[in-house]
Each structure stands twice: as C-alpha cells, then as structure tokens.
C-alpha cells in the first residue's frame, strides 16, 4: 500500500509566476497560434498549475523537498474548498482551450491527463467527498502526526518552521470540525464503528505529553548546524507548543468526534449508503482504474481472481497432505515457526529481504532509483489500525529516503510468511523503485512525475 502522510488541499489563488502572460491571453488567441506557441502555452500553464498545487498544498511541497511553504498547513476550511472549485474550473477551461492538433503524442498526453485530473477534482468536490475529513486510515488527525517523519530538520529555520506549524494546529482542527459538521448536515458520514476507532487514535496522540509526544521526535536528535542556544530555545518552545497548542487541539477534536460526530456515523459500512453512494462508487472505480468498467464488472473480476488464486492455493495445500485450504491455513496459524518472535524480528526480516533483492535489480532494470529506502516501525499511536506495511515516498533529490513503515504490534500473532512478498511490494522492485524513478524522469512535467493512478501503482508493485 502506497500512502502519502499529508493533507493535500486545494487553493484560493493560483501562482502568478510562470504563466502570467498565458493567463492574460484570450483562449481563442492560444487556440489559433502555431504549434510551437501552443506547446509553449501548454507548458507554461502546466507550470502555473504546478506552482498552484505546491503553494496550496504545503505539506505536499515539504514532502517533495520544496520548503517555500514549510511553515504552514493547508487551508482546510469550507470557504477555501469552495474557492478552489472555482479555481479548478478556471484551470480546466484554460487547458481545454488549447488546440493540441499537431502536438507530439507526449504533449497531447500531458494536456489530456491534466484535463482528466482537473475533472476528477471537480467531481470529487461535487460529490462532497471533502466533507468526510476524519477516518481511521488517513484522517487529518493521523496525517498531521504521521507527517512529522517527512519534515526536514537540518537547520534552525526548519525547526522554527515546525514550531510555527505546531502553533497553527488549533486553527487547522477548528477548520476540520467545521467541515465535519457540514458533512453531518449533508449525511456524508463515515461508518460509526470506524469513527469510534478515530476517538481512540486521537486519544493516543493527545495523551503523551512533552518529550513523550510524537511531535517531540525532532527534539531528540538536533543536527550540529543548530547552535546550542537555539537548541535550548527550540526545545523549550516546541514542548510548550505541544502541551499548550497541539494537545489541547487534539483533545477538542477528540471530544467533538466522541460526543457529536461518531454518534451520527452511518450504520451501513458500504459507500452505497451515502447520498449519491452509487455515483460515488462509480467515480471511485473510474478514478482508481482509469477505465470505464462498472463497479459490477470490477467486482465480478475480483471474484473471478479470488476463485482462481484459491484454486491454486488449494492444489498446493493438497500436495502437502492437507484435505483442503482451510485445514492448511489452520496449521500455519497454529505453527509457532510461522510467527514473529519480537518486534525487531519483523523489522530485520524486512531489511534482510530488501538487502537480498538489491543486487538482483541490475539484472532486471536498466534504470535504478538513486534514493535509498529504509524500514521503520509504525508509530505506536496508529499500530492498532495500520496495515501490515506501507510506503512513504522520499524526496526526488534523495535527501530523504523512501520509508517502509512496518506494523510490529502484536508481533506474536503476526505471520512471517508474507513478509518477503510484502517487502518486495512496498520496497524494491515495488513502490520504492517505481515511484523513485517516476519522480525523477526528466521529460515529464512534475504533475506526471507525481501522478498516483492506483491501478497502475498497485499493479506494478
């Protein structure tokens, strides 16, 4: 599973840097220009839209190593989301106005993919998917805490930027509560049983104080570039912000979820239970697969694949002397040799398989990632709800490695049988290889380097 520990929110204003002249030119003028000028107009508009994305998704910018907005959170308010819809519609109009006749296949594809991305953003807003900001896997409360591992802490300014962000957490969470209340009014609610897990998660993040907080991790290892006097100041001010800004904000959010939000959660887990649930399901399938297959077709394909794979597994089970697949699974589950002996045992197995695969890569691939990959334990606050493992991308320049977060909780009941395949899936030659190479391909515009088409990404891995 590939995830991004961030809050990507849209913006009020686009950048006025690279494409100001294009913005001023009438759409008809752009459409009628010669091929070279129209390609130039497309590239300038792509650059403008990319700057817009970074400016208005500061967490995303930080993850990519662009630190211009490293001291702020995305604007999570309803007003901002509404304004961003207008901005997105304007971008769409301008991209569609560019005549791509005579363009190279690459330039045509750049325009087509951007148009698709913008249309998807508009559909998502119109289906009110932004009105469910809290869930147990990628809710805002989890995203902020998990984001700490993606922030650089190389100098005093980066620590001061972090301090500014911590002090702004109460405002961000107030915006989240406003969005959640709008979702309550519109019946756009996550399942109740999952929201009850959110309450537990928030509590586990809020309770640890001072240096025990996940937000205090950067204070445990100051780089030599931060002077001793600044270390003392930052240590004291960051701890104060954690205890006086961050933790009270989490406490307030937790009380809201427990008292107001979770009780209103939907009783049916399926997305079809939402208003326009069928339309949302169709949109999700279309967006994640980039095909025109219906949900029913995708479901039928899934059932067919499960039947095929279980047939192969049953044949293997019988070849090992078992009557059926169920008895084979029961035997594996009860065998102590198939379970981890400690948290470190799980981490070491992942690291061992990745090290084993590394020298094999040149035999299979011509281009290899320059960015390294590291294995880290999932943070304690999300162990109970996290997947077995997940990948967080590194920076394009390799200054921060790709990270495989491994769930080591309840280790005695975790099977080691899937660790090898999962290590390859999340790391190399899976997510880390594909994403690290993609985000450094020189001939692609940044939005394509960072594109996240689920069926492709998961299919590759």
Regions found by a protein language model. Name each.
Residues 24-460:
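N-terminal maturation segment of proteins
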Residues 1-23:
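Gram-negative bacterial Sec-dependent N-terminal signal peptides
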């Amino acid at each position: 599973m590939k995830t991004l520990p961030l809050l990507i929110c849209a913006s009020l204003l686009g950048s006025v840097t690279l494409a100001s002249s294009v913005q001023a030119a009438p759409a008809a003028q752009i459409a009628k220009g010669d091929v070279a000028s129209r390609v130039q107009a497309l590239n300038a508009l792509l650059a403008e839209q990319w700057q817009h994305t970074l400016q208005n998704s500061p967490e995303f910018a930080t993850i990519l190593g662009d630190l211009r907005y490293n001291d702020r959170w995305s604007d999570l308010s309803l007003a901002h989301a509404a304004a961003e819809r207008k901005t997105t519609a304007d971008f769409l109009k301008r991209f569609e106005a560019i005549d791509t006749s005579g363009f190279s296949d690459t330039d045509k594809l750049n325009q087509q993919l951007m148009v698709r991305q913008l249309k998807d953003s508009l559909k998502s807003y119109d289906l009110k998917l932004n009105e469910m900001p809290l869930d147990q896997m990628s809710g805002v409360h989890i995203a902020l805490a998990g984001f700490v591992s993606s922030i650089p802490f190389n100098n005093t300014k980066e620590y001061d930027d972090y301090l500014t962000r911590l002090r702004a957490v109460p405002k961000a969470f107030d915006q989240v509560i406003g969005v959640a209340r709008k979702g309550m009014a519109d019946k756009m609610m996550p399942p109740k049983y999952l929201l009850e897990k959110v309450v537990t998660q928030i509590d586990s993040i809020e309770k640890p104080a001072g240096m025990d907080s996940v937000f205090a991790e950067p204070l445990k290892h100051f780089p030599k570039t931060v002077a001793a006097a600044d270390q003392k100041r930052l240590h004291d001010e960051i701890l104060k912000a954690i205890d006086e800004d961050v933790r009270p904000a989490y406490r307030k959010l937790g009380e809201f979820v427990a008292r107001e939000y979770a009780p209103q959660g939907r009783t049916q887990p399926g997305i079809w239970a939402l208003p326009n649930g069928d339309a949302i399901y169709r949109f999700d399938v279309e967006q994640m697969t980039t095909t025109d297959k219906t949900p029913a077709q995708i479901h039928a394909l899934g059932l067919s694949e499960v039947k095929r794979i279980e047939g192969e597994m049953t044949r293997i089970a019988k070849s090992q002397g078992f009557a059926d697949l169920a008895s084979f699974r029961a035997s594996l589950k009860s065998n102590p040799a198939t379970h981890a002996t400690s948290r470190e045992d799980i981490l070491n197995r992942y690291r061992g398989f990745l090290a084993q695969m590394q020298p094999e890569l040149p035999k299979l691939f011509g281009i290899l990632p320059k960015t390294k990959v590291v294995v880290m334990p999932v943070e304690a606050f999300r162990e109970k709800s996290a997947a077995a493992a997940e990948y967080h991308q590194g920076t394009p320049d390799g200054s921060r490695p790709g990270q495989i977060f491994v769930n080591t909780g309840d280790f005695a009941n975790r099977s080691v049988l899937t660790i090898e395949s999962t290590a390859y899936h999340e790391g190399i030659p899976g997510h880390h290889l594909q994403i690290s190479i993609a985000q450094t391909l020189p001939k692609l515009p940044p939005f394509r380097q960072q594109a996240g088409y689920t069926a492709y990404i998961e299919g590759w891995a």
